[in-house]
């Protein structure tokens, strides 16, 4: 009986203390936000199954910066581009770190480029930037051209056989092959075990994006970490594959010959220690996953937009056809002559951002942004979806209209790859691979709905915003 009383007392004490933490005033300029409840904080307000939309709706009341309790985590939600720049550009040194939560610890042990922090991350970033400069870009882009040819060849066969085209699977293979060449300097073979990674990669992004209450509930973190360590099957599949590739690569490594990104990482990091090996594997894991998933999801949305807006599809096709002037292939050098096509790609990235809220950051000290107080260790979210729907910067944001980007003035709210020191290191490569794939498939094929109806544009929440439902389209050869 006494034991039960003790348990009851501890529960009541925990609830009271938890409530006090959430309601205590921390500064006269503290952020406003919705009213939290004990334990859950404001999570009870994420009811639609699409948290990025719920957060956007809340911003209608509290503006482009507000406070939101993800259970025990004090979180700042941003959808104002001026404040985002003030944080990540003007005060970027205070917003470099990542939060330490069980799911990220399980995935990377805070190693690699995406989830590490502090001096360790600065060193990784410098090495990656150096690698980007030293990599044989001609070899990489020649391979990218070949991957485009392979994609067109597959689509030609689908069209000639009278089959429907499934964008998700073919774009996933295209982006995966591009990253594979960049990291390992190898052509991918989808008849082997690599094809078995497509499902786990999708699930990892879905799980990380949807999150878990136990990640943000401090009292549950130790047990939750142990639980996912013993139950998750997806990350181990991916990491075991990358470990195998790493050890195979090491056998043929020659410090005098730099074949690819992995060679450069080995040269900079390899000492034989377990920690350095983990750093290398975690880094190629980050680049492989991010470089595969976000670009393929964006290409999938581009096809959706072509089908749902056929008049826009024809405008893009007419511009590309005029630009190539009889050639049967679009080159990267043609991009400067295709402003409407580039605007279409930008509008797709705005309308359906590659990421919902991205990977959160944390503050390393108390700081004033604008006139608002941000406490140390606050979790920082950019709501990319809310940013893309900000009516102060985008007229009629719910409409898909590529012409909005035809204005040469850069829209400061267009930040699909984040901004500042910790922006996406592979954004230029991602834009190049998307342009080459998109421009060439539309030069070669006309896309249409298989049933005459528009494709459902609803997205599935995750680290990557992907179409909720896989869809097929009809393709008809143009040339």
UniProtKB/Swiss-Prot annotation:
Q: What superkingdom heads the lineage?
A: Eukaryota
Cofactor(s) required for function per UniProt: heme
Main localization of the protein described in the UniProt heading: membrane
Task: Give the EC number(s) listed in the UniProt record.
Answer: 1.14.-.-
Q: Which residues bind heme?
A: 424
Q: Which Pfam families does the protein's record reference?
A: p450
Q: Name one GO cellular component term.
A: membrane
Where's it found, cell-wise? Membrane
The enzyme's main class, written as a single word, is oxidoreductase
* Segments passing through the bilayer: 1-21
- One annotated GO molecular function: monooxygenase activity
Keywords, comma-separated and alphabetical:
Heme, Iron, Membrane, Metal-binding, Monooxygenase, Oxidoreductase, Transmembrane, Transmembrane helix
Q: Does the keyword Disulfide bond apply?
A: no
Q: Which cysteine pairs are covalently linked by disulfides here?
A: none
User: What is the membrane topology here?
Assistant: Single-pass membrane protein
Name the protein family.
Belongs to the cytochrome P450 family.
Q: What is this protein called?
A: Probable cytochrome P450 508A3
What is the originating organism of this protein? Answer: Dictyostelium discoideum
């Amino acid at each position: 009986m006494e034991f039960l009383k003790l348990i009851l007392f501890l529960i009541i004490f925990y609830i009271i203390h938890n409530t006090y933490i959430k309601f205590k005033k921390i500064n006269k300029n503290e952020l406003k936000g919705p009213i939290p409840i004990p334990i859950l904080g404001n999570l009870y307000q994420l009811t639609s199954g699409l948290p990025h939309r719920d957060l956007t709706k809340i911003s209608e009341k509290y503006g482009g910066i507000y406070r939101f309790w993800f259970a025990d985590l004090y979180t700042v939600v941003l959808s104002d581009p001026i404040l985002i720049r003030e944080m990540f550009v003007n005060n970027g040194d205070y917003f470099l770190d990542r939060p330490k939560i069980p799911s990220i610890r399980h995935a990377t042990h805070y190693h690699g480029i995406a989830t590490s922090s502090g001096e360790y991350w600065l060193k990784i970033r410098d090495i990656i930037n150096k690698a980007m400069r030293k990599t044989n870009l001609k070899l990489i882009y020649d391979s990218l051209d070949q991957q485009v040819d392979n994609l067109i060849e597959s689509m030609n066969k689908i069209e000639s056989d009278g089959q429907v085209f499934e964008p998700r699977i073919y774009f996933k293979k295209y982006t995966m092959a591009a990253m594979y060449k960049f990291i390992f300097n190898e052509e991918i073979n989808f008849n082997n075990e690599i094809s078995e990674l497509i499902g786990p990669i999708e699930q990892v992004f879905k799980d990380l994006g949807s999150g878990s209450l136990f990640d943000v509930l401090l009292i549950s973190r130790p047990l939750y970490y142990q639980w996912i360590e013993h139950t998750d099957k997806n990350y181990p599949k991916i990491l075991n594959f990358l470990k195998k590739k790493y050890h195979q690569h090491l056998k043929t490594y020659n410090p005098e010959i730099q074949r690819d990104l992995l060679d450069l990482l080995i040269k900079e990091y390899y000492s034989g220690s377990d920690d350095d090996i983990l750093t290398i594997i975690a880094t190629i894991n980050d680049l492989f996953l991010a470089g595969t998933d976000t670009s393929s999801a964006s290409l999938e949305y581009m096809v959706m937009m072509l089908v749902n807006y056929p008049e826009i599809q024809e405008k893009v096709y007419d511009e590309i056809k005029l630009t190539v002037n009889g050639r049967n292939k679009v080159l990267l050098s043609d991009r400067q002559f295709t402003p409407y096509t580039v605007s279409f790609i930008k509008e797709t990235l705005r309308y359906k951002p590659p990421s919902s809220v991205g990977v959160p950051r944390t503050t390393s000290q108390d700081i004033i942004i604008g006139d608002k107080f941000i406490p140390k260790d606050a979790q920082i979210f950019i709501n990319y979806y809310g940013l893309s729907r900000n009516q102060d910067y985008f007229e009629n944001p719910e409409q898909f209209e590529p012409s909005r980007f035809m204005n040469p003035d850069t829209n400061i709210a267009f930040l699909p790859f984040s901004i500042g020191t910790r922006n996406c290191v592979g954004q230029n490569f991602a834009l190049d691979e998307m342009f080459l794939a998109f421009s060439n498939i539309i030069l070669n094929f006309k896309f249409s709905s298989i049933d005459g109806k528009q494709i459902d544009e609803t997205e599935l929440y995750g680290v990557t915003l992907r179409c909720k439902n896989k869809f097929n389209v009809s393709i008809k050869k143009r040339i």
